[in-house]
Amino acid sequence: MQVPRVKLLMGSGAMFVFAIIYGWVIFPKILKFMISKQVTLKPGSDVRELWSNTPFPLHFYIYVFNVTNPDEVSEGAKPRLQEVGPFVFDEWKDKYDLEDDVVEDTVSFTMRNTFIFNPKESLPLTGEEEIILPHPIMLPGGISVQREKAAMMELVSKGLSIVFPNAKAFLKAKFMDLFFRGINVDCSSEEFSAKALCTVFYTGEVKQAKQVNQTHFLFSFMGQANHSDSGRFTVCRGVKNNKKLGKVVKFADEPEQDIWPDGECNNFVGTDSTVFAPGLKKEDGLWAFTPDLCRSLGAYYQHKSSYHGMPSMRYTLDLGDIRADEKLHCFCEDPEDLDTCPPKGTMNLAACVGGPLMASMPHFYLGDPKLVADVDGLNPNEKDHAVYIDFELMSGTPFQAAKRLQFNLDMESVEGIEPMKNLPKLILPMFWVEEGVQLNKTYTNLVKYTLFLGLKINSVLRWSLITFSLVGLMFSAYLFYHKSDSLDINSILKDNNKVDDVASTKEPMPPANPKQSSTVHPVQLPNTLIPGTNPATNPATHLKMEHRERY
């Protein structure tokens, strides 16, 4: 079979170009197109089902800072903190009352989080441990009144002494009572000051309080948020434009917030954190709106990572330095006065939650060093306190994540309330939480065998084609160099077969003829077959040696 050198050159070149274009251009576009059609929130799709009812729980850890010297702190001493935790909960997320808008390509829903205590994972903790924390009603209430309604201080002080008789600045209570079951609030007094104080409970301004009967309430940090409405979202479905998948369009039926001084900080940026668009670029970051902070936060790319053998991207985030970053000045009380900005690594939540609370990373990680120095018992480090997300960009899948946040009291002395008049001014850590997920192989295999298997097959195919094309190009170059018109494959195979046949059929060499016409004795040849030395075929063995006399 004759292979013309021109055809071999053209065929090999075409194969090389095809491998490049198909492997690095066409196949990725086909794959992205297929993913974009599958990853949407269209009713009936698999992604919609997983998104609306997460089939597995997230882990939710709570770490509490127990104040070991409460009486001393009440007199102005430096707080000594003891971290207690984690108290482990299974967090189930679901979305209900879903309403689709086909024209706008959006879906509206109400988010619901359900926390179930996991006693096995919490061991040796049981939830019945007694914790000492700043009084969750007296301290925030007294500080807020002093800052915003100082004229009412005397009335509030008297009301607190009636509703919470003999109360101190720090409250000792069981963990489950503080966080879920609730501590008792007695509004049965007929005193005007007590009734005035309890008005905020009856009107629902204290969102953490649950009314038990006509005169009593139960206050807890998270009890009211458990298995209840946590906000109405409207997000893009991604059917018309896959890049907008999950993007928050409205929250609480409003297109933007009305909380911060500047409009830009009131905008919704990113998703609801439960879904992300596929095909993101690593420099785009991962943005999500967090209702607990009334703010959108963006995670930025840190480095490459892997999860169950699959490549991913590690993202992280922090609260930044609001004072130093001009874009964040709208989170200051007065954007024109930088002295009203919170310290580095913190965020003032007063406008969001209506109390003197500050958010930060756990143990003030990446925050102002003074925050750590103001209290004893903190040890900030990246491993335990940083936020991270291992994310697969092409499919938009978060393989594992840990969202960590600490809540602190912006504490100060209050002259009008006896138990609070000597408190030191500092930001006091109360507790921090971690919400995380690690996908098991049931779900990672969906990505592995639909995405990465296709990528691997494409990789093998394109490199195989490139290898074959390069071999063909080298043969073509050889033919052009030797000015041969074609590559005779049959001839090459035939010559190779002849060499093999000769090697297998050669017989041993016969002994040399002892009779010579010369007195010169020939060198004895070995009986091995060396090309050109066989006596039967070598013409030198038939030459006669002529004797010449010397002169």
UniProtKB/Swiss-Prot annotation:
Membrane-spanning ranges: 8-28, 460-480
Biased composition range(s): Polar residues: 514-540
Listed InterPro entries: CD36/SCARB1/SNMP1 (IPR005428), CD36_fam (IPR002159)
Single biological process term from Gene Ontology: detection of chemical stimulus involved in sensory perception of smell
Compartments where found: Cell membrane
Pfam families: CD36 (PF01130)
Record-annotated disulphide pairs: C265-C330, C294-C352, C332-C341
GO cellular component: cilium; cytoplasm; dendrite; neuronal cell body; plasma membrane
Residues glycosylated per entry: N66, N213, N226, N440
A molecular-function term among this protein's GO annotations: scavenger receptor activity
Ranges in the topological domain labelled Cytoplasmic: 1-7, 481-551
Annotated membrane topology: Multi-pass membrane protein
Taxonomy, superkingdom: Eukaryota
Keywords, comma-separated and alphabetical: Cell membrane, Disulfide bond, Glycoprotein, Membrane, Olfaction, Receptor, Sensory transduction, Transmembrane, Transmembrane helix
Extracellular face residues: 29-459
Region (Disordered): 501-551
Similarity-based family: Belongs to the CD36 family.
UniProt function note: Plays an olfactory role that is not restricted to pheromone sensitivity.
Name under which the protein is recorded: Sensory neuron membrane protein 1
Originating species: Drosophila simulans
